[in-house]
Amino acid sequence: MSLKWTDVLEIAIQLDESKPEVDPRYVNFVDLRRWVVELPEFSDDPQRSGEKVLEAIQAAWIEERD
């Protein structure tokens, strides 16, 4: 499975599994973007991320953690 920026929930799940020590409420977007791009299954253009998609990923990650 290859991940795109639109796969918000799956990205959040993978971040939650790979970064259990991180509290997603306090993640800055620079780190979040880097971690998404570094996911093994991520295959989208790294330059296509924007604030809205990063906010959606962060919100989904917070929800996943709860």
From Swiss-Prot:
Task: List GO BP terms, alphabetically.
Answer: iron-sulfur cluster assembly
The protein's name: Uncharacterized protein PA3808
UniProt-listed Pfam families? Fe-S_assembly (PF04384)
Residues in coiled coil: none
User: Annotated Gene Ontology MF terms?
Assistant: ferrous iron binding
- InterPro entries, per this entry? ISC_FeS_clus_asmbl_IscsX, IscX-like_sf
Family according to the record: To E.coli YfhJ.
Judging by the UniProt lineage, the source's domain of life is Bacteria
Q: Name one GO cellular component term.
A: cytosol
Q: Which PANTHER family match?
A: PROTEIN ISCX
